[in-house]
Curated annotation (Swiss-Prot):
Family from the record: Belongs to the acetokinase family. PduW subfamily.
GO cellular component, one term: cytoplasm
CDD domains: ASKHA_NBD_AcK_PK (cd24010)
Protein name: Propionate kinase
Catalyses which reaction(s): propanoate + ATP = propanoyl phosphate + ADP
Compartments, as annotated in UniProt: Cytoplasm
Keywords: ATP-binding, Cytoplasm, Kinase, Nucleotide-binding, Transferase
Species, as recorded: Citrobacter rodentium (strain ICC168)
PANTHER family recorded: ACETATE KINASE, ACETATE KINASE-RELATED
SUPFAM superfamilies: Actin-like ATPase domain
Primary residence: cytoplasm
Task performed by this protein: Works with phosphate acetyltransferase (pta) to capture exogenous propionate and regenerate propionyl-CoA during degradation of 1,2-propanediol (1,2-PD).
EC number: 2.7.2.15
GO annotation, biological process: acetate metabolic process; propanediol catabolic process; propionate catabolic process
Length: 403
């Protein structure tokens, strides 16, 4: 039986959405409403081979969702909003409470609100999106899908920071990890493509984009991940530094009089590829600058690959070996150069890349003689969200869909 499921990602001034026909995972439409709250909000809707774009005043998220539902019926994608049988919402932070996606109830919403102190930029707007859909589609079941939930299988040695214990007990300061929905999707899809149970695999998943994180997956469970208490930590990213010596921060505060807010701005918005290259946060722009002879751009690319390679190495040691390395995200899926740089000099591990396969973005890019599979898999967090709606709200197990 077919079910129409919506996957929603609400931002502070945007609303991304997909409508999927489940359990087949067929994409019926997708779109984005951006610049919410402004007179020139951008509205994009794609369905099959058709695309509609316009600008219009969109006062708030309620108006955005109303517009979205009107577009679905107005363009004939569905006959009535009654056809929507479930809604899945991406939520940034589930803390230690949510070890899986959860049906939206008053209790669920109260806990998401309580956890907003751990994700003050994201949980409140995620909550806003959920509440608007509850008001406009009160009889449609909803599921909250948490970026952090997949990493709740980490053991204490992986998630505890070596700080005084009371900071964990009182404030919940620990490694949480993010991009969990993406890491879960690509590892499951990898196992499908290999025809091997995920429980039998040791995988390192590399979600590389403007925000990047790595995840060690053993037996289908996350055993380590590079992002920590916040999405700022781990490997170098587009504008985020990743891990640095923490004493740099009080030193800068004393030397330049920087406030905590200014230091946070520096680490999150002025560092990474942008900070080192001085060119851009976009990997493609930095590549072009490096090819034009910019030494700082070349250094930024080297640093990016080195930090990722070092993390991969530590995860291989932790898992006692590696069966597959997976690349996903905007950079991971599209930059053959980044993949080649990251896999450089790893032949001693049985990991090497075939240049021709890599250049054409083949699904498997390892050399014929390589012991370790190297895969390029387009992530599909929306499909993962829709699957969780089916599993939790509609009590059905979705069939596997290819990436």
């Amino acid at each position: 039986m077919s079910h129409k499921i919506m996957a929603i990602n609400a931002g502070s001034s945007s609303l991304k959405f997909q409508l999927l026909d489940m359990p087949q995972g067929k994409l019926l439409c997708q779109g984005l409403i951006e610049r919410i709250g402004m007179a020139n909000a951008g509205i994009t809707l794609k369905a099959q081979e058709q695309k509609w774009q316009q600008t219009a005043p969109v006062a708030d998220h309620r108006e955005a969702v109303t517009l979205l539902l009107d577009m679905l019926t107005g363009h004939g994608i569905i006959r009535s909003i009654a056809e929507i049988e479930g809604v899945g919402h991406r939520v940034a932070h589930g803390g230690e409470t949510f070890k899986d996606s959860a049906r939206v109830t008053d209790e669920t919403l109260a806990e998401i609100e309580r956890l907003a102190e751990l994700a003050p930029l994201h949980n409140p707007v995620n909550l806003l999106g959920i509440n608007v859909f509850r008001q406009l589609l009160p009889d449609v079941p909803a599921v909250a899908v948490f970026d952090t939930a997949f990493h709740q299988t980490l053991n204490e040695a992986a998630y505890i920071y070596p700080l005084p214990w009371r900071y964990y007990e009182e404030f919940g300061i620990r490694r949480y990890g993010f991009h969990g929905t993406s890491h879960k999707y690509v590892s499951a899809t990898l196992a499908e493509k290999l025809g091997v149970p995920l429980s039998a695999l040791r995988v390192v998943s590399c979600h590389l984009g403007n925000g990047s994180s790595l995840c060690a997956i053993k037996g289908g469970k996350s055993v380590n991940t590079s992002m920590g208490f916040t999405p700022q930590s781990g490997v170098m990213m587009g504008t985020r530094s990743g891990d640095i010596d923490p004493s740099i921060l009080p030193w800068l505060a004393q030397r330049e009089g920087k406030t905590p807010q200014q230091l946070n701005q520096l680490l999150n918005n002025e560092s990474g590829l942008l900070g080192v290259s001085g060119v851009s946060h976009d990997y493609r722009d930095v590549e072009q600058a490096a090819d034009a002879g910019n030494p700082r751009a070349a250094l930024a690319l080297t640093l990016f690959a080195e930090r990722i390679r070092a993390t991969i190495g530590s995860y291989i040691m932790q898992m006692g070996g590696l069966d597959a390395l997976v690349f996903t995200g905007g950079i991971g899926e599209n930059s053959a150069r980044a993949r080649a740089a990251i896999c450089q000099n790893l032949q001693f591990l049985g990991l090497s890349v075939d240049e021709a396969k890599n250049q054409r973005n083949a699904t498997f890019i390892q050399a014929d003689h390589a012991l370790v599979k190297v895969a390029v898999i387009n992530t599909n967090e929306e499909l993962m969200i829709a699957r969780d709606v089916m599993r939790i709200a509609l009590a059905e197990t979705p069939v596997a869909a290819s990436a």
